[in-house]
Amino acid sequence: MGFVPVLIQPANAQASNTTSDKLIAIDILLQPDQTMMSKANAVNDRLRENYAAGYSLGARHAPHVTLLQRFVRVKDLDTVTAAVAEVYAQNPPIGLQLKVEALDYVIWGGVAVTVFVVERTPALMQLHEKVIAAVEPFSMSGGTKAAFVGDDANSETIGWVEHFIPASSGPKYVAHVTLGVAHEDFVKAMKAAPFNAFTFGVKGAAVYHLGNFGTAAEKLWQYAP
């Protein structure tokens, strides 16, 4: 499904060369309504039954639809969120209706990271592209696990953020909601089962500090229209 990042150097990211330019890995995301939360938690329960070392959804693993993941300097966070707020003022995200088309997975760190694949509607793509343009002047490269919450960010997680542009953006953007992790054979069977598509709404928008497996681990900013 195009969910695995291609390790290509982003053309529009600057390198961070000084210790004063501390980087943070951020996720500019949409927050789903209760319909999605209920569906996501139901799948997560099944995943954790199969893989007890997995994580449960909640405040430190918030279900979401990513618009953009980037490394930025900590000192630029206020400017970044102001730029994103300007995009949302002209392109309101709250109330958008989105459709889940399928369940899929990718292998990261030896486990199957499981997701709902979300339809790329014109409104969603417009938000994605405008947020990229707004954040581009502040995007940095060279982030390490120190840029994430905790100290366990694996190479796949770091690479995903580093190479989100161009490997996971524009025509390669796969909108999704991450549901948790489990053993591949279990998730492969889930994927093969009949799937009932469903719609859900966007109730909010925020910026989070990323954790391992691309989880939304700590809220940094909440959009207030």
Regions found by a protein language model. Give the residues of each.
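Bacterial N-terminal signal peptides
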Residues: 1-6
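Basic, often amphipathic N-terminal segments
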Residues: 10-107, 121-206, 210-225
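Acidic/polar active-site rim loop that often engages polyanionic ligands
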Residues: 108-112
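Surface-exposed, active-site-proximal loop segments in enzymatic domains
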Residues: 115
